[in-house]
Amino acid sequence: VRTFIDSADKLKVLNARHVMARPSCMMRLSDGANYGLNEMRRRGFSSIYVVGDHMQLEGLITLESIIRALKENISLKDIMIRDIPRVTTETIISDILPIAAEAKYPIAVVNGEGELEGIVTKAMVLSSMI
């Protein structure tokens, strides 16, 4: 068994569930811009994930955008980035690698119902290869 495990290609065996971290910075649109800004400050993040009432991933809002929304009284819906990289919990690392190489933000990990389960950063993907 040890020989098999040592010889297995980690990139084709490990999936997002194995390397992801639980998302710690998230909000609902109904929480408002001040809440989002305070969460980012409190947790030390420059972006925040937006989820629906049942944790479905809606998108992401950056620190710069939320500050602009507050200054210019812009709706969070108008500044939310909807087209963000996402994978499922079962996506293997070899399929995540090219996404991570191009991603500006951590990759969202969703389950079969589209609910946010975790995030995967470039560092997490690279460290899984070691």
Residue map of PLM features:
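C-terminal boundary and immediately downstream tail of ABC-type ATPase nucleotide-binding domains
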Residues: 1-22, 130
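Phosphate-coordinating loops and pocket residues in cytosolic domains that bind phosphorylated ligands
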Residues: 3-6, 21, 68, 72, ...
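Short low-complexity stretches enriched in small and charged residues
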Residues: 3-7, 37, 62-65
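Bateman (tandem CBS) regulatory domains
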Residues: 12-26, 62, 72-84
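The conserved cystathionine-beta-synthase
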Residues: 26-46, 50-54, 67-70, 85-113, ...
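Short hydrophobic-aromatic micro-motifs
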Residues: 60-61, 120
